[in-house]
Amino acid sequence: MTNPPLLCSYVMEQTMKKSLLFTLAIGLAFATNSQAQSISLPGGIKLEEVDFERHVMAVVGKMGCNGGVCHGSFQGRGGFRLSLFGYDFEMDHEAIDERIDTDDADDSYLLLKATLQDDHGGGERFKVGSWQYRVFREWIAKGGERKAGSGRVVELEAVPKVVRFRGPGTSAQLKVMATFEDGTKENVTPFCDFRVKDDYVAELGDGGLIRSRYPGDTAVAISYLGHVRAAKILVPTKVQPGFIYPKYEITNYIDRAVDSRLRQLNVVPSVVGSDEEFLRRVTIDTIGSVPTPDEVRQFVADRNPQKRSKKIDELLNNPLHAALWATKLSEITGNDTDSLEQPREKRSRMWHDWLRVRLERNAGWDEIVRGILTATSRGDREPAEWVQAENQLETAARAGFDTDYSERSSLDLYWARRNVNLEQVSEQSAAAFLGVRLQCCRCHKHPYDKWTQSDYRSFANVFGQVKRGASAVAQGAIQAENQRRQGMPQNQRFAQLREVFVDVGNPQRLNDPKTNQPLLPKAPGGPELDTGSDTRTQLLEWMLEPENPYFGRAFVNRVWEHYFGRGIVHPVDDFSVGNPPTNPELLNALADDFVKRGFDIRHIERLVLNSRTWQTSAVPNETNIYDKSNFARSYPRRMMAPVVVDVLNAALGVEQQFTADAAEGERAIQVAATRVRDGNLRNTFRIFGHSSRKSACDCDGSEDPSLSQTLYMMTDGFVMQRIRNGRLRQLLAVGGRMQRLQNGTIEHDELAEVLREMSLAIFGRNPMVDVVWAMINSREFILNH
């Protein structure tokens, strides 16, 4: 029998050994679970220490987990809500912290869901053991802590900034370096989101790998923790050994900038277009019509070497040129008939006339924008004088289309639209005058630009002083006038009189979305503004500074887009970090010239139209057949809806009256209203994408081709009626041609003359090539029958 004291000692010894072993096991387990381990990332990068803000939240964003359709939505998903696009690290850490297990990282609810080990509506976001998984696991195992402010980026750099491929079918690696507020610099390439703008030119692989596909240029937008950079991609055309770039005429700095880019891409521009091609294009682009057969013959026969420049000057001074641009600017500035007071269509006409008159006398863009952006109703007039002028205006508007509104110094209708709030007018102003889309910042930080919700609200507050109603000075006169109007017969009653005025002392304010404190008015990327005076005027002065990065560049880009079918920045109202210009040297040269010339619109137009670049043929050569953005040739493009109507009528030789929508003898391009009464005109406008002018961005209208447009031109009864009753009927009526055509006895020479006249009217050139083309492309030719 064992001695009891010895037994007790033995038991105690064994117990202590087991306890020690257990303690060691726990310690080893803890060490295994918490000791930082190097993580191998794509591209051979070693991550020594995982940071919540820099790495974990970057993976969350890269996987799309904090997007608007997932956990970043306002209500979240499955009870789990993150800040949209990761704008709030503190909120995100609190939400994620509830779904991790620091004692057993692999058993964390977050990882089980993301790897689909547990049911997940968002599917599998990454696999167990992947580098993304290891980033999460390592951070959880370390305790799931957050170092506040560690992810504040002060600079994001793409290396290289321009990727120059040797040709299609090769690869290159982008590297992204982030500099943080604490001074550290890190290769964050695996944590970035990459998006290629044109995947025809290049496609993306994993982790910033880019493969060239076809000749051209594009950009890759790189996003990391809400910061955006873009890298330019150039893929030159393959050329034969010994290729020598040809010489051709350089007319002005436009041609030099375009030539410089084309040489980098081994792209040769098309030849200069023929006289017929030039005349038709310039007439459509400047006055929204086509030349008559007589004009074509006279221009082709003219031997003056300056005839193109003379024709350009002639057309730029044509009243229809101002009307065309007044229609374009009506779309840009939001001349929406439905948002105006009665008589709505006439007020749209006033808006259009105000723009047209200034364009006719070639007022500078700065002057035009000043009249819009800083507009008030009374100006310097006394209330009684203004009330009298308003009554005269209302009476003239009811009687016809002509009023004296265009003589007013400012366009107060821009601010007098109904149901347009502070946010909407700020979005419209940013897009129209700065070329910047701020709409998405109403709810969250812009995913591909630098703008935040605070930037958005600070800019909106610039316009918070503008009121519509009755100012203290004019209140008595306005109330008396409205009482008088109320007593008028119903069918003669004018709308309630309201003035647009500035109320410096009691502005509307949007608060900071985080602190709920008032935000001072501020220009986008510019200074805070003094609230003691009209902040709109201060904004305008900032816009007109020569070094302003938006105002001049945005408008010359719109001019370029009008004449080429696409902007140097495209879309034209999307100047952003993630959407760089295709040719920044060209854009900067145009903008600098525009500012130096006092914002002279016609000067820029004249330069563009006289350039070889604009006058190139639409026929491609073997080097530029794939070009879509470097202006190596003229790009075929659709016309504005009103121009389609006018061109069709001019080509067919018919006059269409729009008596319900425009004065007698006016064209569709002079119809100001968006609510059109003429049924045929309304139908054509709808089919050809006429802008409703209800949206702040240029996406509201469309000039893209569609099946409905093709069917309209082929089968619409109104089109067929104009064909039968227009120029063709007139030509066939000469000498009984119609009867002899029906009898099959018409002479060949007579029929050729008819074809020639119709082709000159429609295409601006001799028809023979087109007749042969039509024959060999017919079913009768291509099929055996």
Briefly describe each language-model feature range.
Residues 32-36:
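Sec/Tat signal peptide C-region and signal peptidase I cleavage site
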Residues 37-133, 150-177, 185-250, 281, ...:
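Solvent-exposed helix-loop boundary motif
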Residues 2, 13-19:
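Positively charged n-region of N-terminal signal peptides that target proteins for export
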Residues 112, 126-146, 708-725:
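Catalytic cores of secreted or luminal carbohydrate-active enzymes
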Residues 246-320, 325, 331-660, 699-700, ...:
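Primarily short, surface-exposed interaction patches in extracytoplasmic proteins
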